Amino acid sequence: MASAGKPTLDDSRRATGSPKMKARENAKDTLCRNVTIYGRCRYEDKGCAFNHDPHKVNTTYQSDSRRRLNVDSPSFTPSLLSSNGSSPTTASVTAKKAATISPKAANAAPFQPRNITSRSNTSTPSGRAETMTPDWSVAEVQEFVPQGFDTAHMASLQGNSNGGVPSTSPFDPFVTASNPLSAASAVGPVQANPFAHDTAAAAAALGGAFFAGQSGFQQPVQYHLYAPIGPHSQNTLGYQRNVHDLFLPNDFREELQKKAAATLQTLPNTQLPAQVDYFHSLVPLDLNHQKNATIFGFPSWVYKAQSSKDGNFYALRRLEGFRLTNEKAIRSVQAWKRVCNGSVVTVHDAFTSRSFQDSSLIFVTDYHPLSKTLAEQHLGAGNRFQGRHNTHIPEQVLWGYMTQIANGLKAIHSNGLAARILDPSKVLVTGKNRIRLNACAIMDVVQYDTQRSIAELQRQDLVNFGQLIVTLGANTPSVMHNPTKAMEHFTRAYSPQLKNSVFWLLNGLQKDQDRNIDIFITGISSQLMSTFDSALHLDDELTSDLSRELENGRLVRLVTKLNFVNERPEYEHDRQWSENGERYFLKMFRDYVFHQVDAQGDPVVDLGHVLSCLNKLDAGTDEKITLVSRDEQSCFVVSYKDIKKALESSFQALLKPTRRLH
């Protein structure tokens, strides 16, 4: 049995009876599998005995079938059955050569050109010398570049019908031979190449059929990665980071939190009415509890209140003891509702009320928490250190105030109205160098019967504007009692351009020339550009801060998915669903993140550990961790990538429609 299973050396050298050599004789009619799988054979020029032309294989099979069916066909050996590259004319010569073949010749077959048909008719042994000299050059073989398809490339794979040597094209892994015995199906259906960058060229090469003008596929955004958005004002090295690169700036965060706390502030055990019309939860905002009727002619108070209609917070300004004599006076507030400007506090409503046990006039405006007035900010109003000297206002800050006030006056005058009040105690500072005109609609109701034209009131606004700037520049509220001394101080402290602009405003009542807010804005256009540039820088800074808070709820989504899967009592009538398979080590991962204990058995409450684990889970890193069950009988060594895959698959299983049993 051993001798029969292992042939001797003499038997292996007998080519006539060896099935191995018989297979090699038929190799010229067999299409190389490398062409079918990869599109070309890398050993085609290094001794591969199989055929590398699909078109020729089909022709050979068809010719063989015709010869077998034709009784008049002569008896001769086809040239394609040659195994050594020579072209003998008789079957006896072929058998003789096959009988005397050496083992070295079997292992290293001579080169066979692709278009072997052109040399198959030679009947002399001199054909061996021709086959040893290749008729192609290395320059014809192009390196594979995964670009779009072209018709020449497809034609070269399908074969050349005129018998010439086909041009060598780059290998394309997306073109395969589906049937090696059929020339029509030698090349499979052309699919889209995802590595091609020019989809339009590919569509044009294929005739434009079934190609829509759409963009290429893009991977989804990884929400656990944050791209730094400019501007980048700090020159730091690549490995350096600071707190502001990761979180919201502390001062900005504290400011927003303080404003939120001030908005939600309540005053228990107050003597204020519980409800004023449709407002409730009143909180006084005045710092001075003394009655002052200098500005409006009536004592005024300011409150914060919440609306019962929309739940928003508003500021209520109450004029104490006001009696409405003309109903048209309060209707004049409707015109102020159309004024929508960033430098003017928006007016929403006005009504009379007896909730304060008197006749009061209530104005409803926007509420800006923690805002101050210009008098409190620069003139020391409401400050307990009244004797301390106020700081000098920089000229650039003063120009910023002027441009914002001019912006508000232009919006008011464009609607056919007049501000009528430009006092430091009625201009709010809602942010850093950010001001808004307040209490503008009150005088239209209080002094409704005063017969003054709108043009005259608008010119008076210019004069009040100039007096406000002089008061701020002199740092004292009583400066207008001595205008000459005030202007001398203003001239010494500020530039001639600012001084000339203020002089122009103070002369607004003169009728020698036309004076309006548009002419004034044209005169300070250079400063408007500076203020506009500062606003653009602030917008960039806020956008950069906002980008750090992008997708800040991703960890909450992870914890939510974990809680959906863990400890689920039943799913599809399976009470052990959350305890089997990949859901089991999700439960162990939950214990690893939240239920760790130290060496003494005390709970470990470490927010940094929780955030680190959840961030790694969100990223799906390859870091491996050891998960141990509660009874210490099971232990898993898994990566965060595996845990993320298990979490997603378990969560997607919950989203599938349930199968109902009937």
Curated annotation (Swiss-Prot):
- Specify where the region named Knob domain lies, as residue ranges: 565-662
Q: Which InterPro entries match?
A: Kinase-like_dom_sf, PAN3, Pan3_PK, Prot_kinase_dom, Znf_CCCH
Disordered: annotated span: 1-26, 59-131
Q: Keyword set for this entry?
A: ATP-binding, Coiled coil, Cytoplasm, Metal-binding, mRNA processing, Nucleotide-binding, Zinc, Zinc-finger
In this chain, the C3H1-type zinc fingers fall at: 26-55
GO CC annotation terms, alphabetical: P-body; PAN complex
From the Swiss-Prot or TrEMBL record, what is one GO molecular function term? zinc ion binding
Where along this sequence does the record place binding of ATP?
Answer: 317, 366-373, 425-426
Quaternary structure note: Homodimer. Forms a heterotrimer with a catalytic subunit pan2 to form the poly(A)-nuclease (PAN) deadenylation complex. Interacts (via PAM-2 motif) with poly(A)-binding protein pab1 (via PABC domain), conferring substrate specificity of the enzyme complex.
Protein family according to the UniProt entry: Belongs to the protein kinase superfamily. PAN3 family.
Task: State the domain notes.
Answer: The N-terminal zinc finger binds to poly(A) RNA. Contains a pseudokinase domain. The protein kinase domain is predicted to be catalytically inactive because some of the residues important for catalytic activity are substituted and it lacks the equivalent of the binding site for a peptide substrate. However, it has retained an ATP-binding site and ATP-binding is required for mRNA degradation, stimulating the activity of the pan2 nuclease in vitro.
Outline what the protein does.
Answer: Regulatory subunit of the poly(A)-nuclease (PAN) deadenylation complex, one of two cytoplasmic mRNA deadenylases involved in mRNA turnover. PAN specifically shortens poly(A) tails of RNA and the activity is stimulated by poly(A)-binding protein pab1. PAN deadenylation is followed by rapid degradation of the shortened mRNA tails by the CCR4-NOT complex. Deadenylated mRNAs are then degraded by two alternative mechanisms, namely exosome-mediated 3'-5' exonucleolytic degradation, or deadenylation-dependent mRNA decaping and subsequent 5'-3' exonucleolytic degradation by xrn1.
Its recorded name reads: PAN2-PAN3 deadenylation complex subunit PAN3
